[in-house]
Swiss-Prot record:
Location relative to the cell: Cytoplasm
Main subcellular localisation: cytoplasm
A Pfam family annotated for this UniProt entry: RecA_C
Xref: CDD domains: RecA
Lineage: Bacteria, Pseudomonadati, Pseudomonadota, Betaproteobacteria, Burkholderiales
Name this polypeptide is given: Protein RecA
Family designation: Belongs to the RecA family.
Disulfide bonds: none
Functional description taken from the UniProt entry: Can catalyze the hydrolysis of ATP in the presence of single-stranded DNA, the ATP-dependent uptake of single-stranded DNA by duplex DNA, and the ATP-dependent hybridization of homologous single-stranded DNAs. It interacts with LexA causing its activation and leading to its autocatalytic cleavage.
Gene Ontology biological process terms from the UniProt entry: DNA recombination; DNA repair; SOS response
Matching PROSITE patterns: RECA_1 (PS00321), RECA_2 (PS50162), RECA_3 (PS50163)
């Protein structure tokens, strides 16, 4: 009995000491710097923004890319990296968010961005001279708390100042990796606090002399691999033809890392030249998989009504009938357990810290 009392007394003393420590931390670092997971203040539902691809939203498990996190999108040349990020920018702008594009490659096509649905008049753009400048601008924008999405295109183009000012043949090993490591250490906390989504586009390089495993690696060292909550590997797997003309690419995205849902899921979609991700094509494919759209031979039907012979015609039908496309999409989302988009009011998404 006495032992029990002693144990209870010790527990009470610990509780008192913990309360004093928590009070001291809050006084020193501000309210919310530490809290219990059971308290209502902790965000349980992750706020997301759609990728513009229904299949990829589903593969990510939470309905899109998580806000307040670092995301890396990498792949070979002409695989659709910039197209995918511009689609995310367009989706964020639809929610009323403010977006910035750090164009380190100096290669952003404004007309193409506009065709993908980006409001280029409202898009903030920077074309920095050095990697340090690009990351300082990113840091300043994140700290402002008024930016919802920042895209850095690309990590490979974040050239350290010492390399730009040096001679062409100078060997400066690990300089870019150190720059990225320092920047991400500084950025991560602020990104979470301001609920800003930061997307790094990255390129692929080949490791020399690799006998086993993949010889592919991404540029900029290992820091980004650790700090990224989501890593997407995007690949072009085929061409889409209309007659003899190639009108787009068949694309595969693999969720290589995911801290907010199970990883290693894959999404397949079409990127049409000049139009971006074919959402109607995805709705058809996923609708067939979920048995919401019937496919008989080359014909596609919905609710017993034929919507087109061949995928091109069915895609065109859904483009001309957006209400039916939305209805099928909502049924697909319900069947796969993903919440419908825009279920959170825009004002709430933008103002929440």
């Amino acid at each position: 009995m006495d032992d029990k009392k002693a144990g209870a007394g010790l527990s009470a003393e610990k509780q008192k000491a913990l309360a004093a420590a928590l009070s001291q931390i809050e006084k020193q670092f501000g309210k919310g710097s530490i809290m219990r997971m059971g308290d209502g203040e902790v965000e349980k539902d992750i706020q997301v923004v759609s990728t513009g691809s229904l299949g990829l939203d589903i593969a990510l498990g939470v309905g899109g890319l998580p806000r307040g996190r670092v995301v890396e999108i990498y792949g070979p040349e002409s695989s659709g990296k910039t197209t995918l990020t511009l689609q995310v920018v367009a989706e964020m702008q639809k929610l009323g968010g403010t977006c910035a594009f750090i164009d380190a490659e100096h290669a952003l096509d404004v007309n193409y961005a506009s065709k993908l649905g980006v409001d280029v008049g409202e898009l903030l753009i920077s074309q920095p001279d050095t990697g340090e400048q690009a990351l300082e601008i990113t840091d300043a924008l994140v700290r402002s708390g008024s930016i919802d999405l920042i895209v850095i295109d690309s990590v490979a183009a974040l050239v350290p100042k010492a390399e730009i000012e040096g001679e062409m043949g100078d060997s400066l090993p690990g300089l870019q990796a150190r720059l990225m490591s320092q920047a991400l250490r500084k950025l991560t906390g602020t990104i979470k606090r301001t609920n800003c989504l930061v997307i790094f586009i990255n390129q692929i390089r080949m490791k020399i002399g690799v006998m086993f495993g993949s010889p592919e690696t991404t540029t900029g060292g290992n820091a980004l691999k650790f700090y990224a909550s989501v890593r997407l590997d995007i690949r072009r797997i085929g061409s889409i033809k209309k007659g003899d003309d190639v009108i787009g690419n068949e694309t595969k995205v693999k969720v290589v890392k995911n801290k907010v849902s199970p990883p290693f899921r894959e999404a397949f979609f079409d990127i049409l030249y000049g139009q971006g991700i074919s959402r109607q094509g995805e709705i058809i494919d996923l609708g067939v998989d979920a048995k919401i759209v019937e496919k008989s031979g080359a014909w596609y039907s919905y609710n017993g009504d034929k919507i087109g012979q061949g995928k091109d015609n069915a895609r065109e039908y859904l483009r001309e009938n957006p209400d039916i496309a939305q209805e099928i999409e909502n049924k697909v989302r319900a069947a796969l357990g993903v919440a419908p988009m825009n279920s959170v009011p825009a004002a709430e998404v933008v103002t929440e810290d």
